């Protein structure tokens, strides 16, 4: 779930392929195409986003202990360049966003807008 882990997995795959090739007396070659980099939040920005979300929906509705997921995102490139946090705005049950039957829950739009407005208010308070 990070670049070191990714490199370790690639090296391990190469070792397995080499071992199998040696066992069968053949030559083998692996090409690994790296996709998106891992999406890794900056801890302070993730905490900041959780605080803003708690302001909007209450801390009991904010889950900051989600298990890491293997998915990657183009936002990963932004997180490599700048501190930040990628989060998931819960929209209830149903298919995932990349599923062809995905149906956006319009009822969460005001909640999402309130969250993003709160992020701005916390980052740039009016004095």
Stretches with model-predicted labels:
Residues 1-127:
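Metal-dependent amide/peptide-bond hydrolase catalytic core
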